[in-house]
Amino acid sequence: MGLLAKIFGKKNVAERKGEPDMVVVPEDNEKMDWAIEKAGLTLWYFEASLKNPSPGQDYFSIKVMIIDGENGEHIWLTDPHFDDEGNLFGTVGNAPVNVHNVKLNQKIGIKRELISDWMIIENGRLIGGYTIRAIRDTIPDQDKMAFDQQVNLYIDEGVDHFKANLETPEGAILSLEKAYNYKDIHAAMDCKDFFEEAATLLSGMDMDLNKEVINETAELLKLSFIKNIEENGFPDFSGIQNAFPERKKIDETHWVITEVCWHADGGKSVQQLNTYKSPKGWVVLGPKGPKE
């Protein structure tokens, strides 16, 4: 019995001769759903890198959902490329288990909405590969090294390439850090919502809340934000690579985002940030509170 069959149970793993075993993941798996969503939100980076690879980038591969009647299977394609309309073409990279309308090494074309993951190896390190990470996250820590050896990949938190805009919580964090790097106080404040930050802060205190109290607290937070930058300068995020391994939903408009920062000197820091979906888009409220 292979490693994955031992970890997940034999009925949940398809063992394939000469190829890595395939883990069967339930359709309602929250981690896998987020992995597929994350792959879609960062697909632009894969496409840009595929079009103009940087030194050290190789092994471009992309995962797609193949549908055969009532059956479906996520399969990796090698040698991927896109046409002018965004349709994907590639070579089936592993032997299908549940579908029979494609076969190993077959060249196929498929619509981009069926893309479920992508991966690049950058200087020996896995970038993307979110569905691989979702499976790995369920493995006991003592078995992770053996898993990495079996799939023959170096896997850490990676580097995520969300677009720096207010369309996602992660994009809002990157937008704020970009504003810091450009020393643009107005752009930084556009990534904030001091009223909501005040409401969130005060909600954890044993006191009566009203709009006037929240507004006064919001004004204090705003003044403190500006004063801190004037006295201490802008935080420096230049040369930092970011990963966002986890989202925690508080409610429909509040998410706590875990950010990993890889520093130029090789160091790593981790922070958890409270984000909020405001009328203008996602904004950054501040570090996670003790009750979140």
Regions from the PLM with identified roles:
Residues 57-67, 240-244, 256:
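Long, contiguous regulatory modules within eukaryotic nuclear regulatory proteins
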Residues 200-267:
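Surface-exposed, charged secondary-structure patches
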Residues 156-185, 194-200:
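Short, low-complexity N-terminal intrinsically disordered segments enriched in polar/charged residues
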Residues 119, 254-292:
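Short beta-strand edge/turn micro-motifs at domain boundaries
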Residues 63-67, 91-93, 255-264:
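Short beta-strand segments that buttress and anchor functional surface loops
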Residues 8-57:
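OB/S1-fold single-stranded nucleic-acid-binding modules
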Residues 39, 72, 81-85, 89-160:
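Cys-His-centered catalytic/binding microenvironment captured across papain-like cysteine peptidases
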Residues 67-78:
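Short coil-to-beta-strand transition motifs
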